[in-house]
Each structure stands twice: as structure tokens, then as C-alpha cells.
Amino acid sequence: MVTEEMPVQPLAGWMERLVAKTSTPIAAVDASCIVPLPLLDRSVSRAFEYRDATKELYASRVDKDYIEQDVDCDMFQADLPFNPVCLQDCCLSTLISKCDIDHAVAPVADTPGGSRAGYQRWERFKKLGLADYEIHRNDASHHEGVSRMSAYLHFGMVSPLRIAREASEHGAEKYLDELLI
């Protein structure tokens, strides 16, 4: 099993319990940073400290072209202990109504999920906000001052490597500091 390396609670605790309960090999990958935290030789707490500590590793990684890799493996053929759901063909509202969640909490209207929405938001921010991010990032009244990409990054809907590479192409050093720490 391959999972995201998340050294924060409760995720770290969940992973420890999973490791204790299974004999399945588990690989944790830090996919949220250009330079994974385990490569640092010391702890840092400020974005500029991280930048300084990772300068050489960062420079060798951030401008590399992304190479698409074909996955060459057998399809999983065993029986599942549940009926699979094809999200392309199902009625999402019916499916969601069956979830054990608080249905009184409405969706966030201006933050639709998915990669397409995430990259649309990123493209808009690149055009309207990235160049002035350093100036407007702490001004809550400036709507285009921040990227509002956190949910898309946190839940894996967009690639932090792609975002970092594209921000780097625009010379957005302060945005990269905030993205990567």
C-alpha cells in the first residue's frame, strides 16, 4: 500500500495503528513538498528557514520537467467484500444521502471539488493574483490576494509539484515559501 506521509495528528496515529494491524507492506511518500521533510537535517519553523535549509535540493528539483510515467501492472481481479460504485454512472445525491455524515452541513458553494475545479482556480490565480501575492497575501479584503488552493492541495486534487513548478516559472518566491512549508 502506498500512502501520503503526514507527520501530523490524527493522521500519524491512524497510520501507526494500521501498521500494527496489518502485514501488508506500506510505503509512505511525502508528495506535498518539493523537498521531503526527512531529507532535512534539522527542524525549521519559518518559511524562509525552510527555503534556506533546502536551497540546493530545491534548485535541483523544482525546474525538472514532469515526466508522465505509464503504469504497467496487472489489474486487480479478486472479489471485493463490497459492491463497487462507478462514480461516472451513479446519482451522486443518492449516494451521498446514504453516507453517515451531518447532512445539515451544506457544500461550500464557491469551492467545488475535483482536479478540474482545482486547476481552474490555480489558472485564475496565476493570471490575477500570483504576481502580487507577496504584497496582498495578508490582506483579507483583497479577494485575489491568496490562491485559495489549500483544499485542492490537501485532498490531492491538484499536484503540489505542478503548482510549485508553475509558480517557480513566474518567479513567485514568496508563494513558493508559503506553499512548501
Residue ranges, per PLM feature:
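Trp/Phe/Arg-rich N-terminal binding region typifying the photolyase-homology
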Residues: V2-D70, G171
